[in-house]
A protein has these predicted regions:
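Bacterial N-terminal signal peptides
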Residues: 9-22
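Conserved hydrophobic positions within beta-strands
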Residues: 42-44
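Short, structured beta-strand/loop micro-motifs enriched in basic residues and often containing a Trp
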Residues: 74-82
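OB-fold/S1-family single-stranded nucleic acid-binding modules
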Residues: 103-126
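Short boundary/loop segments of OB/S1/cold-shock single-stranded nucleic-acid-binding domains
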Residues: 24-38
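Short aromatic-glycine-enriched beta-strand elements
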Residues: 50-60
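Short nucleic-acid-contacting surface segments enriched for D/E, G, S/T with interspersed K/R
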Residues: 82-97
Length: 134
């Protein structure tokens, strides 16, 4: 009887461990257009300071007055703190200059590389993704 209980327990443990594997997953950078950089000026609408990534949302107005809403990601808060960033560094309405690595599909989404704050200070978020090694 105890062998049967042990076998059931072992099977349940293996099943739970297998079911938990997706929790350890993380998205890659295949969606980003590696090496491409786009610079723009915009108005901050929201700064989201949260795990697993922080997000900067901002509006960019083109020469015709059309507004495009961008959302770009950075790293996690602890990493951003190490880079000198903070939870309260952006306020809605802040005018910023942003350099992003956009996604390949052309949507207004990307990885934030650099931002020039309203006070003129440049903050670096990340290095652009690199292509495969030769």
């Amino acid at each position: 009887m105890t062998n049967k209980i042990g076998a059931v327990f072992a099977a349940a443990l293996v099943w739970l461990m297998a079911a938990a594997v997706p929790v350890w997953g993380h998205h890659g950078s295949a969606a980003f257009d590696a090496g491409k950089q786009v610079a723009m000026k915009g108005t901050v609408t929201q700064w989201t300071w949260a795990n697993p990534h922080c997000f900067l949302s901002y509006d960019v107005k083109d020469d015709s007055g059309n507004v495009t809403h961008w959302v770009v990601e950075t790293s996690n808060p602890p990493d951003m703190i190490n880079r000198g960033w903070s939870k309260g560094m952006f306020k809605p309405g802040d005018e910023v200059s942003v350099t992003v690595e956009p996604v390949k599909n052309g949507k207004p989404v990307g990885r934030l590389l650099d931002v020039v704050l309203p006070n003129g200070k440049t903050m670096h978020s990340a290095s652009p993704a690199r292509g495969p090694a030769n």
